[in-house]
Design a protein with these regions (language model features):
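Soluble catalytic domains of membrane acyltransferases
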Residues: 8-13, 17, 21, 26-197, ...
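Phosphoinositide-dependent membrane-docking surfaces
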Residues: 49, 97, 324-356
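Short amphipathic C-terminal alpha-helix that caps PH/PH-like domains
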Residues: 88, 194-209, 375-390
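A conserved mid-domain beta-alpha-beta active-site/ligand-binding segment of alpha/beta enzyme cores
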Residues: 183-184, 195-228
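Cys/His-rich short segments
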Residues: 217-269
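Short polybasic amphipathic segments
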Residues: 247, 303-305, 328-333, 355-361
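Anionic N-terminal interaction surfaces
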Residues: 265-322
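Acidic, Ser/Thr- and proline-rich intrinsically disordered linker/docking segments
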Residues: 344-401
Length: 401
């Protein structure tokens, strides 16, 4: 006889949400300057909430706009931290998913929550923006929406990147706004083609912070921008270093980050991080990998390398490891031994948080964390540039996030 599955949605989740709201709503207003517009609807029903991903507090912002519990689709990494993860699962029951991978179990769990009457929320980008522009949204979101058959609620967050860019540890003073952009009923999206529904989601969730006229004041405005950038418009692949409000390249190029989000430098070709980031993506997509030397393009030392057991735990393998990035592989040195991960055999490479690197390789998951200045993005971008060889269209330009 089959054992009956435990219910995913619990009454305690609503109680905990209400208690947390009393603390987190004023917290987000004070810390992030958030103006959260409450969603008021007479009908009490469940939704699939899709939001653009700008800050580490997006789930608090979204949750503050709605009554009742919201079940978030979140990175599996949040369930690998022992007691804290178990407490989180008990309190709010997030739905874990493998980043940038097809995760059937996550879809099944979402169907289960929907069947139980729960509201589900996710960021279709799958990653928090590094540039201030809404990132690539995979077409698979359309099939996901159609599978759940819930009213689709599109939620926009504006100003979050200005308040705290993904690459920064500092929170700046400015204005953040969260609001419902549109509600799409199942009867409406059932009449749309897949292309039309995808275009609608992309349009309603698209935000470009580089076009903002707001100012965001604070200390060390450019600090750790090198987590997001590793290509110099003058010398190409490079290592950048930030200090205070400035970021500099080893070639001597120096740029200042201003409170309005603009860049200031002598004859510097980009006025915003978004322009520089787009140039970096174009540069990588235009690289002729065959012309690159068979030597490390980058070497990072002093890395904490862990083995991750998805949804369960992580085990530290080396607190002083090394990673070498080649044109076609990543070589890890763990406890004195080398492990070669070719781009062909890496299933998924992704960035977690500000600068953690996860590599899914032949049934194993390696997590790599460096110092404050570590750039995980370059490993992901080069890996996908290799994998995209021969592909056309937007999929051929997708660099992992």
């Amino acid at each position: 006889m089959k054992r009956k599955k435990k219910q995913w949605t619990k009454f305690r989740h609503r109680v905990i949400r209400n208690l947390a709201y009393a603390v987190l709503y004023p917290y987000t207003r004070i810390k992030y300057g958030a103006r959260i517009e409450k969603f008021r609807e007479k009908q009490k029903r469940q939704y699939l909430i899709a939001f653009n991903h700008q800050t580490a507090a997006d789930q608090f912002i979204v949750g503050s706009a709605f009554k009742g519990a919201v079940y978030y689709v979140a990175s599996e990494d949040i369930l690998t931290n022992g007691f804290i993860s178990r407490l989180l699962s008990w309190a709010v029951a997030p739905i874990p998913i493998k980043k940038q991978a097809t995760d059937v179990s996550a879809v099944l769990n979402c169907k289960r929550v929907a069947k139980e009457g729960g509201t589900i929320a996710l960021a279709p980008e799958g990653n928090r923006t590094y540039s201030g522009k809404t990132g690539y949204i995979k077409p698979a979101i359309v099939a996901f929406v159609r599978t759940l058959k819930l009213p689709l609620l599109l939620y926009r967050i504006e100003g979050g990147y200005g308040v705290q860019p993904r690459w920064s540890d500092e929170v700046r003073k400015g204005k953040l706004r969260g609001y419902v952009s549109r509600v799409v009923e199942p009867s409406e999206y059932q009449q749309m083609t897949d292309e039309q529904l995808l275009a609608l989601i992309q349009k309603e969730l698209y935000v470009d912070e580089s076009q903002s006229i707001e100012t965001f004041t604070g200390k060390n405005l450019a600090q750790y921008l090198e987590r997001a950038l590793y290509v110099c418009p003058k010398c190409g692949l490079t290592t950048l270093k930030s200090a205070g409000d400035e970021i500099a390249c080893s070639c001597g190029e120096t740029v200042r980050y201003l409170p309005n989000g603009k860049l200031q430098g002598e004859n510097f070709p980009f006025s915003t991080v978004a322009e520089w980031y787009d140039y970096q993506c174009d540069f990588i997509n235009g690289l002729d990998l065959n012309s690159l030397p068979n030597a490390p393009l980058y070497t990072d030392c002093g890395l904490r390398i862990s083995s991750v057991q998805p949804y369960k735990r992580k085990t530290h393998l080396d607190m002083d490891g090394r990673a070498e990035l080649y044109k076609d592989k990543i070589v890890l040195t763990i406890a004195g031994e080398t492990t070669e991960l070719t781009f062909e055999t890496i299933d998924v490479a992704t960035v977690l948080g500000r600068n953690k690197l996860n590599l899914y390789h032949q049934g194993k998951v390696y997590q790599i964390k460096g110092d404050k200045r570590f750039n995980a993005l370059k490993y992901v971008n080069l890996c996908y540039r290799y994998k995209n060889a021969g592909k056309e269209g937007e999929d051929g330009k997708f660099l992992g996030l």
